[in-house]
UniProtKB/Swiss-Prot annotation:
The modification Phosphoserine is found at S19. Keywords: Phosphoprotein, Repeat, TPR repeat. It comes from the Eukaryota. Residues 1-24, 86-146 are annotated as: Disordered. Residues 1-14, 86-100 have a biased composition (Basic and acidic residues). The gene is KLCR2. This is Protein KINESIN LIGHT CHAIN-RELATED 2. TPR repeats lie at residues 147-181, 200-233, 243-276, 285-318, 329-363, 369-402, 411-444, 454-487, 495-528, 537-570, 579-612. Belongs to the kinesin light chain family. Coiled coil: none annotated. One of its GO terms (biological process) is pollen tube growth.
C-alpha cells in the first residue's frame, strides 16, 4: 500500500531536513541546539536595541531571514502530515493601527519611515487576513511580580534566561526569568514604540522556551500577542517584527500538527515581507522557498512548484551572473524534489544536477552528498540502476568520512541501497544493507533525532514486507510506533504507521486484527482536524478489504465509497489508487446484488486501463474477464444467488509485494 514512491520520498526528505527554512541543513540537525542558537540571536538583538540609536537593531533580527540572524526555532520536525484533535483555525492580525480619525487599511499603503515605498501586493497571491486575534496572555504572566520598571532590567533578565537555555541546565528557571522580562517591558513600554519592539522580542524568546518545554499550547497565545503589538505603518522594523511573529507562530502550528494553519501564517508573513522589502529582495526568495517546502509537506505540489519557481527567479536576479548562488542551489534541490513527487523524473534530475554543481563550486561537500542521494532516487525511478548505485555510493563515502560510519545519514544511504537491490532482485545484498542500517538505528549516536530513527524503521519495514518477511516488518513498525507514542502533534503520523501495520497483518491473514488496527488509524485520521488526504483514502480502501474478509459487506461498501470520493478529488479518476478502489467497489456492488452499478463501474475501469496500459496488459485482461462474467450473468437475469465477493475482488495492488509503506 502506498501513495506513490515519490511521495514517500517527500516525507523522508522532509523528516531529514527538519525545517523547511533550511533546505541545505545537515541531516543531523538537533532541535535543542537550533533553539539555543535562536535564543542567543534574539538576546543579541535586544541588547543592540538598547545600545544603538542610529539603526534599529530589531532590523537585524526581523529583516534578515537568512541563516545569520533569522527568527528561526528550527523546531519543525514533520515526518508526516500531522494534526491535533479539535483545533480551530486561527486568524492573524495584519491590519493597520486605528487612526484618531478612522481606521487604516492594508490597501492604503504609506511610505515607511526610511522613505522606502511599500511594494504592492501581487494580485496572484492570497489576500492577507484582516481580522484581529483576541489579545491573550499566558496564564503564567499573572503570577509574576516586578517592582522595577527599568528596561535595562528586562535586558539583564533576558541575558540570564539565555544563559540558562544555552547551558541546558534549567529551562523552568529560564522561563521564570523570561516571564519577568516580559512583565518589565510591559510596564515600561506603554506608548513607546521602541520599547514595544523590546516586548515583542521578549515574547518571541518566551515562546521559544515554552516550545523547548513542550508547552506548545502556552506558546501560541504568546506569539499571537507578539503579532498584535507591532503595526505595519509604524515603520519597517515594526512590520518585520510582525512578519517574524507570523513565521514563528507558523512553526509552532507545524509542531502541533496543524499544517493548514501553519501554511496560512507563513503566507501572511510572506505578504508582509514583500510589502516591506519589495518583490525581488533575496530574503523574500528565502521565504518563498520556506513556504514552498511547507506546501510540499502538505502534498500540495502545484502551489509548491509555483512558490519555488518564484524563489528561484528572485535568487537568479540577485545572484552573480557567472555562478549560481547557494540559495539558487537550495531552490533547485527543492524543485527537484517537487518534480520527483509529481513523476517528472527527468526534470527532477536536471534540477538536482544543477544544484550539485553549484554546491560543489562552493565546497559544500555534505550538501552535495545529500543531493547525490536525491540524484540516486531519480535514477532509480528511471530504472537507471547502475547510475543510481554510483550516486548512492558517492554520497555514502562522503557521509562516512565527514560524519562517521555510525551516523544516521550513513544509515539512510544504506536503506536507499537496500531498496535498490531489492528492486533488481538481489535479495542477499538488500538484506545486508538493511542489517547495516538497523545496527545504526538500534544504537543511534547521541543527538540523533528519534524521528529519523522511526523513519528508518518504517523504510526498512517496507523492504522486509516486500520480501514477505512479515514478522520482521511488523516488529519494526511497532518500534516506530513506540517512538511516536504520546508525542504532541503526531496523530497523523501514528495513524499512518498503524495503517501500514494493518496492511501487514492483513497479508499475514489476521483479518480481525487488521480490521481493529485500521479502525484505530481511521479514527485518528478523522480526528486530526486536517483535510482528508490521499493517504486517508487509501487507508479506507484497505479497511474495506479487511471488512470483505470478515463478510461485513455493507460496511465495506461504505468505506470504498468514501475512499472513492477522496481519491477522485486528491488523485483524479485515472490514478491507479482510484482505479483500485473502483474495482473493489464493483465487486462489492455485485455481492450486494447491485449488478448494474457493478457493470457500470467495471466498464469504466476496463476502458481506462486499456487506454493507459494497453489491451495486452495482464491487469487489463483480468478486468475484462471479470466484466465479461458480469455481463453474461446480467444477460440471463441473475436473481437467485450472488457470485462470492472474494472471487470477484481483484488482488489489491496496494498490498502486493514490493510496495512502499504508507506514512
Amino acid at each position: 500500500m502506498d501513495v506513490g514512491e515519490s511521495n514517500e520520498r517527500v516525507k523522508d526528505d522532509s523528516a531529514l531536513q527538519a525545517s523547511p527554512r533550511s533546505p541545505l541543513s545537515s541531516i543531523d540537525l538537533a532541535i535543542d541546539g537550533a533553539m539555543n542558537a535562536s535564543i542567543e540571536q534574539l538576546y543579541h538583538n535586544v541588547c543592540e536595541m538598547e545600545s544603538s540609536d542610529d539603526q534599529s537593531p530589531s532590523r537585524a533580527s526581523f529583516i534578515s531571514y537568512g541563516a545569520e540572524s533569522r527568527i528561526d526555532l528550527e523546531l519543525r520536525h514533520l515526518v508526516g502530515d500531522v494534526g491535533e484533535e479539535g483545533e480551530s483555525k486561527k486568524e492573524i492580525i495584519l491590519e493597520k493601527k486605528e487612526e484618531s480619525n478612522g481606521e487604516g487599511s492594508l490597501s492604503q499603503k504609506k511610505p515607511l519611515s526610511n522613505g522606502k515605498k511599500v511594494a504592492k501586493t501581487s494580485p496572484n497571491n492570497p489576500k492577507m487576513p484582516g481580522s484581529r486575534i483576541s489579545s491573550r496572555k499566558s496564564p503564567d504572566l499573572g503570577k509574576v511580580s516586578v517592582d522595577e520598571e527599568s528596561p535595562e532590567l528586562g535586558v539583564v533578565l533576558l541575558k540570564q534566561a539565555r544563559e540558562l537555555v544555552s547551558s541546558g541546565e534549567n529551562l523552568n528557571k529560564a522561563l521564570d526569568l523570561a516571564l519577568r522580562a516580559v512583565k518589565v517591558f510591559e510596564k515600561c513600554g506603554e506608548g513607546e514604540k521602541q520599547l514595544g519592539l523590546n516586548l515583542v522580542m521578549s515574547l518571541h524568546i518566551l515562546a521559544a522556551i515554552y516550545a523547548g518545554l513542550g508547552r506548545y499550547n502556552d506558546a501560541v497565545p504568546v506569539l499571537e500577542r507578539s503579532i498584535e503589538i507591532p503595526m505595519i505603518e509604524d515603520g519597517e522594523d515594526h512590520a518585520l517584527a510582525k512578519f517574524a511573529g507570523c513565521m514563528q507562530l507558523g512553526d509552532m502550528y507545524g509542531l502541533m500538527g496543524q499544517v493548514e494553519n501553519s501554511i496560512m501564517l507563513y503566507t501572511a508573513g510572506l505578504e508582509i515581507q514583500r510589502q516591506v522589502l519589495g518583490e525581488s529582495d533575496a530574503r523574500v526568495g528565502e521565504t518563498c522557498r520556506y513556504l514552498a517546502e511547507a506546501h510540499v509537506q502538505a502534498m500540495q505540489f502545484e502551489e509548491a512548484s509555483r512558490l519555488c519557481q518564484m524563489a528561484l527567479d528572485i535568487h537568479k536576479e540577485n545572484g552573480a551572473a557567472a555562478t549560481a548562488s547557494i540559495e539558487e542551489a537550495a531552490d533547485r534541490k527543492l524543485m527537484g524534489l517537487i518534480c520527483d513527487a509529481k513523476g517528472d523524473y527527468e526534470v527532477a534530475l536536471e534540477h538536482y544536477v544543477l544544484a550539485s554543481m553549484a554546491m560543489s563550486s562552493q565546497n559544500h561537500r555534505e550538501d552535495v552528498a545529500a543531493v547525490d542521494c536525491s540524484i540516486g532516487d531519480a535514477y532509480m525511478s528511471l530504472a537507471r540502476f547502475d547510475e543510481a548505485i554510483f550516486a548512492y555510493q558517492k554520497a555514502l563515502a562522503v557521509f562516512k568520512q565527514g560524519k562517521g560510519e555510525t551516523h544516521s545519514s550513513v544509515a539512510l544511504v544504506y536503506v536507499r541501497l537496500a531498496d535498490l537491490y531489492n528492486k533488481i532482485g538481489k535479495t542477499r545484498d538488500s538484506k545486508s544493507y538493511c542489517e547495516n542500517a538497523l545496527k545504526i538505528y538500534l544504537k543511534p549516536t547521541p543527538g540523533t533525532p528519534m524521528e529519523e530513527v522511526a523513519t528508518g524503521f518504517i523504510e526498512i519495514s517496507a523492504i522486509y514486507q516486500s520480501m514477505n518477511e512479515l514478522d520482521q516488518a511488523l516488529k519494526l513498525l511497532r518500534r516506530a510506533l513506540k517512538i511516536y507514542a504520546n508525542a504532541p502533534g503526531q496523530q497523523n503520523t501514528i495513524a499512518g504507521i498503524e495503517a501500514q501495520m494493518g496492511v501487514v497483518t492483513y497479508m499475514m491473514g489476521n483479518y480481525s486484527e487488521s480490521y481493529d488496527i485500521f479502525k484505530s488509524a481511521i479514527s485518528k485520521f478523522r480526528n486530526s482536524g486536517e483535510k482528508k488526504t490521499a493517504l486517508f483514502g487509501i487507508a479506507l480502501n484497505q479497511m474495506g478489504l479487511a471488512c470483505v474478509q470478515r463478510y461485513a459487506i455493507n460496511e465495506a461498501a461504505d468505506l470504498f465509497e468514501e475512499a472513492k470520493t477522496i481519491l477522485e478529488k486528491e488523485c483524479g479518476p485515472y490514478h491507479p489508487d482510484t482505479l483500485a478502489v473502483y474495482s473493489n467497489l464493483a465487486g462489492t456492488y455485485d455481492a450486494m446484488g447491485r449488478l448494474d452499478d457493478a457493470i457500470e463501474i467495471l466498464e469504466y475501469v476496463v476502458g481506462t486501463r486499456e487506454e493507459k496500459l494497453g489491451t495486452a496488459n495482464p491487469e487489463v485482461e483480468d478486468e475484462k474477464q471479470r466484466l465479461a462474467a458480469l455481463l453474461k450473468e446480467a444477460g440471463r437475469g441473475r436473481s437467485k444467488r450472488n457470485r462470492a465477493l472474494l472471487t470477484l475482488l481483484d488482488n489489491n495492488p496496494e498490498i502486493a509485494n514490493g510496495q512502499r509503506p504508507v506514512y
